[in-house]
């Protein structure tokens, strides 16, 4: 290369240094000073990664003094360049020597980089275009946020997330039965809200015992990095902000923390977009005395736009508390408990109409009359005729049924606020097999009960019943050696024998009290050396996690995990299928929670429920009531709480006194009422609610689409190629897995999210679900998103020169390929990407300016191209400049036509969708007060904002490739 003092060059490998000046040429070496950074670089003259900077006529060049010149003539003298032209401000004729050009000039625009000789490798141009196409595909998908989480494609979960996650500020109660995956539904909704920009700041309130579990679950399944806040963390955060909640975007904390007025005030002032409350059935309320927990959540729900309440038992703690939770979501809608009860009485007619529509038979007169009355403002006659017709396409009939069903669900009841799936409507659960094991009552307990009976005159019947259910507690109360009960308790003998005969099985044991759990662990360890671990509320979160992990280990882990009632809440152990109930809780909901630790979606085996009970005691009588009255061991019992409240007095009496006639009478009454409630639930609101909650055929279609995306081999190829280009080491690890590691030759100094010691990944959902240590890669995964951002956010691939070997074309024929981006700058929360996502517009010009992009497929064209040495490419560009400048202007015109067409479509789509949504909401609001005015106002404002953003849309040249035909 011919170097001379004062010449301006740019580094091909360190463009951030700015413009360099040759300060020394000696022998085979050349030294450049980069004044913008004050750094020197020495290069070999023969192989210097440098490009000579020479501007062209019509370019605007800035001097180091700050003024600019529009170049009209370029003169070279003594190997240095002088630019003649017009002063950009005064209009005077001026000259500018290259030594006086601004040191900070960066060649960011593709055309500037091309003319400056900063030409990328051919494959980088291709990967940049593929990245832009992938970003466009992801942003324009209505499945955004559902594809990436490491969860099974379970219809009702994905359906609820799809319906709720795309709303503005959703306010809903997720009330699926135990084991149906409410945490996953909440995670999917949060993931969707964050990816679509509808939410940026989220506060999750969970029981203290579940904080760490939520933290791990959100990271492992959804790649959401929450921070756990407790009092210590709040104190530490003062160094960064007076309000600790402003130091993180995604926060998990307990209700205990927010009971403190100072912390609650700070949380109220923290501008959250979404509030999530787990175990919401603990929020007790009465009109006169709402609980402190309820008041905390109520205060937050008044200032946070979006609210998700999670509860497995909507009526636990009473129907009034269920109403109170709905009141948190929409106090204007649920303003009066009596009015709510009156409204519920009208649900049966709606449910009957929905039942008729969800079948396949023709509608009877009663169903038609109900539909006509319920949908009086709609013209439903055409749909009715279609359903009743004989020779009509079944798909059309089904569409008519679905349409009317959707109208019905939209207009009546709590369908938009409450989602509740039951096991009856969700398939795939194992059987529950109940195994009672009667044991003889130890004499020590008989004596303790006799003594207690003489001393318990003033105790309430419920207190007496609870004592009768735990004879070991009574014994401990009267004996100094509180630990000795497990030495003679026949249930402990049975438990040891059972574990010894099932050594290869994992067994979950649940007892009411933490002290009982600890004593059982001691008994197993000291009497037989059985490996067991304990799980109770007195342990820290980390201690509980370690215990759970020890139990989960297949080879060296504990055979048994012994949990207390409270300690096991919210924890799931589907890998075990044997459950031992060492005692029974005096609440059918708590019994269901115990069984729900194993009876969940994902359980592969039938669940064996074992109950060692003491014969002739309160334990046996409670077992009979649960088993023969409620069938609560082998089936879920949604009416359990109602039945318990109704028969609490009789049940308590039977538990305290052994009266066979009273027991028989109680069982008869319970069975009769159980059947009544079961039939009423079948007829009433639950049926309608479940039709809306599980999504039916629409949910199945959604799952089919997600499964098709899982099988997209094109995505796998694109992502692997992306990692290849960036320089990520990829090692095939077998079993559909790859190990990714940073390498020393990566394009970028760091790859955020890629650990130094590597990470194992898979593109296969089933593989990811079977192993927690493997990341599930989809187009939504941070490792993919980061890769796309690294490429598209840098200059990688913005310029390229290639040779087309095609003898059908004259040698020297020139093509210019331009990739423009439709650039509509708008905040993510505006949802503009739904109508105008970042869209690449490809223009392929021949030398006459004709656009061949629609005639010449990109992939076919790409296959015919060959790379060109960078120095040769630079010379080819310089020689072709007279042709390239007018072609660039022509390309801008062609791309503008493409943008105009995109804008027309985007505006039409936006207007059509939002107008339809607004009209739908307005129609619904007239008949269903469940529609909030904020939702309507949001749609109106969104239309106005989006029109403004579309008006301001511009074209951005993203990449440029010059192609020359060669016959060599």
Curated annotation (Swiss-Prot):
KW Nucleotide-binding (keyword) present: yes
Domain Helicase C-terminal: 491-641
Annotated EC: 3.6.4.-
UniProt-listed Gene3D superfamilies: 2.30.30.140, 2.30.30.930, 3.30.360.80, 6.10.140.1500, 6.10.140.2230, P-loop containing nucleotide triphosphate hydrolases (3.40.50.300), Tandem AAA-ATPase domain (3.40.50.10810)
Tagged with keyword Chaperone: no
Entry keywords, A to Z: Activator, ATP-binding, DNA-binding, Helicase, Hydrolase, Nucleotide-binding, Transcription, Transcription regulation
One BP annotation, GO: regulation of DNA-templated transcription
Domain Helicase ATP-binding as annotated: residue spans: 163-332
GO molecular function, one term: DNA binding
Pfam families membership: Helicase_C, RapA_C, SNF2-rel_dom, Tudor_1_RapA, Tudor_RapA
SUPFAM superfamilies hit by this protein: P-loop containing nucleoside triphosphate hydrolases
InterPro entries: Helicase_ATP-bd, Helicase_C-like, Helicase_RapA, P-loop_NTPase, RapA_C, SNF2-like_sf, SNF2/RAD54-like_C, SNF2_N
Residue interval(s) of motif DEAH box: 278-281
UniProt-annotated binding residues for ATP: 176-183
Family: Belongs to the SNF2/RAD54 helicase family. RapA subfamily.
Binding partners and assembly: Interacts with the RNAP. Has a higher affinity for the core RNAP than for the holoenzyme. Its ATPase activity is stimulated by binding to RNAP.
Known role: Transcription regulator that activates transcription by stimulating RNA polymerase (RNAP) recycling in case of stress conditions such as supercoiled DNA or high salt concentrations. Probably acts by releasing the RNAP, when it is trapped or immobilized on tightly supercoiled DNA. Does not activate transcription on linear DNA. Probably not involved in DNA repair.
PANTHER family: DNA ANNEALING HELICASE AND ENDONUCLEASE ZRANB3 FAMILY MEMBER, SWI_SNF-RELATED MATRIX-ASSOCIATED ACTIN-DEPENDENT REGULATOR OF CHROMATIN SUBFAMILY A-LIKE PROTEIN 1
Protein name (database record): RNA polymerase-associated protein RapA
Gene name per UniProt: rapA
């Amino acid at each position: 290369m011919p170097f001379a003092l004062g010449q301006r060059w740019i580094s091909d490998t360190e463009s951030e240094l700015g413009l360099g000046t040759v300060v020394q040429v000696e022998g085979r070496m050349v030294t450049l000073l980069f004044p913008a950074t004050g750094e020197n670089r020495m290069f070999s003259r023969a192989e210097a990664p440098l490009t000579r900077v020479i501007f062209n006529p019509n370019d605007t060049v800035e001097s180091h003094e700050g003024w600019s010149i529009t170049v009209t003539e370029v003169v070279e003298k003594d190997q240095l360049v002088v630019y003649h032209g017009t002063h950009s401000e005064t209009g005077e004729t001026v000259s500018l020597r290259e030594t006086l050009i601004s040191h900070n000039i960066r060649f960011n625009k593709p055309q500037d980089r091309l003319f400056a000789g900063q030409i990328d490798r051919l494959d980088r141009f291709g990967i940049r275009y593929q990245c832009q196409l992938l970003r466009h595909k992801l942003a324009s998908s209505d499945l955004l946020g559902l594809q990436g989480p490491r969860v099974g494609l379970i219809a009702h979960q994905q359906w609820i997330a799809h319906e709720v996650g795309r709303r503005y500020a959703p306010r809903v109660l997720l009330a699926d039965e135990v084991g149906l995956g409410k945490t996953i539904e909440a995670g999917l909704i949060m993931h969707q809200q964050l990816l679509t920009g509808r939410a940026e700041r989220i506060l999750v309130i969970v029981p203290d015992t579940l904080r760490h579990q939520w933290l791990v679950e959100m990271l492992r399944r959804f790649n959401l990095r929450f921070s756990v806040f407790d009092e210590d963390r709040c104190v530490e955060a003062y160094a960064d902000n007076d309000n600790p909640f402003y130091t993180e975007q995604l926060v998990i904390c307990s209700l205990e923390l927010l009971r403190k007025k100072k912390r609650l005030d700070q949380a109220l002032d923290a501008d959250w977009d979404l509030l999530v409350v787990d175990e919401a059935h603990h929020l007790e309320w009465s009109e006169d005395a709402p609980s402190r927990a309820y008041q905390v959540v109520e205060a937050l729900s008044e200032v946070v736009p979006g609210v998700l309440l999670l509860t497995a038992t909507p009526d636990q703690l009473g129907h009034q508390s269920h109403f109170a939770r709905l009141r948190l979501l929409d106090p204007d809608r649920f303003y009066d408990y009596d009015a709510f009860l009156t409204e519920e009485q009208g649900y049966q007619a709606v449910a009957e109409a929905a039942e008729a529509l969800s079948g396949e038979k023709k509608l009877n007169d009663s169903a038609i009359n109900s539909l006509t009355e319920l949908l009086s403002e709609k013209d439903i006659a055409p749909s009715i005729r279609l359903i009743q017709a004989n020779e009509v396409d079944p798909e059309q009939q089904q569409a008519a049924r679905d349409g009317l069903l959707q109208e019905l669900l939209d207009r009546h009841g709590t369908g938009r606020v409450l989602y509740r799936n039951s096991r009856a409507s969700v398939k795939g659960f194992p059987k529950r097999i109940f195994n009672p094991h009667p044991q003889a009552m130890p004499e020590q307990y008989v004596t303790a009960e006799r003594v207690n009976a003489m001393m318990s005159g003033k105790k309430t019947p419920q207190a007496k019943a609870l004592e009768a259910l735990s004879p070991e507690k009574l014994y401990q109360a009267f004996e100094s050696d509180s630990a000795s009960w497990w030495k003679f308790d026949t249930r402990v003998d049975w438990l040891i024998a059972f574990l010894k005969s099932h050594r290869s099985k994992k067994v979950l044991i649940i007892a009411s009290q933490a002290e009982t759990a600890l004593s059982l662990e001691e008994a197993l360890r000291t009497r037989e050396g059985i490996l067991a671990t304990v799980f109770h509320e007195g342990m820290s979160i980390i201690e509980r996690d370690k215990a759970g992990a020890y139990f989960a280990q297949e080879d060296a882990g504990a055979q048994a995990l012994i949990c207390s009632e409270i300690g096991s809440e919210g924890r799931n152990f589907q890998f075990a299928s044997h459950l031992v109930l060492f005692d029974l809780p005096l609440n059918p909901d708590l019994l269901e929670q115990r069984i729900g630790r194993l009876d969940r979606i994902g359980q592969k085996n039938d669940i064996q429920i074992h109950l060692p009970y003491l014969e002739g005691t309160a334990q046996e009588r409670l077992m009979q009531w649960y088993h023969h009255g409620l069938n609560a061991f082998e089936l879920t019992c949604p009416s359990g709480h109602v039945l318990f409240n109704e028969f609490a007095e009789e049940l308590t009496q039977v538990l305290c006194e052994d009266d066979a006639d009273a027991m028989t009478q109680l069982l008869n009454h319970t069975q009769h009422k159980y059947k009544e409630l079961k039939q009423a639930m079948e007829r009433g609101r639950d049926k309608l609610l479940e039709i809306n909650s599980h999504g039916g055929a629409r949910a199945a279609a959604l799952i089919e689409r997600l499964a098709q995306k899982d099988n997209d081999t094109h995505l796998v190829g694109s992502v692997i190629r992306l990692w290849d280009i960036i320089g990520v080491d990829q090692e095939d690890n077998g079993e559909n897995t790859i190990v990714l590691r940073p390498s020393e030759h990566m394009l970028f100094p760091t790859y955020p999210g890629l650990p130094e010691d590597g990470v194992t990944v898979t593109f296969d959902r089933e593989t990811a679900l079977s192993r927690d240590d493997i990341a599930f890669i989809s187009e939504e995964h941070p490792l993919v998103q980061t890769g796309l951002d690294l490429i598209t956010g840098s200059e990688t691939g913005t310029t390229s020169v290639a040779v087309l070997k095609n003898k059908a074309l004259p040698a020297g024929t020139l093509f210019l390929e331009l990739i423009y981006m439709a650039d509509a700058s708008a905040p993510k929360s505006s949802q503009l990407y739904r109508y105008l996502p970042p869209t690449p517009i490809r223009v392929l010009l021949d030398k006459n300016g004709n656009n061949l992009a629609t005639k010449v497929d990109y992939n076919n064209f790409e296959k015919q191209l060959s790379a060109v040495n960078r120095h040769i490419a630079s010379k080819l560009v310089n020689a072709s400049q007279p042709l390239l400048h007018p072609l660039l202007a022509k390309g801008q015109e062609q791309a503008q036509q493409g943008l105009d067409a995109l804008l027309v479509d985007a505006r039409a789509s936006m207007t059509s969708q939002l107008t339809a949504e607004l009209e739908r909401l307005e129609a619904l609001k007239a008949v269903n007060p469940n529609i909030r005015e904020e939702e309507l106002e949001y749609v109106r404002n969104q239309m106005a904002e989006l029109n403004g953003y579309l008006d301001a849309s511009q074209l951005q040249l993203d990449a440029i490739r010059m192609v020359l035909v060669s016959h060599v």
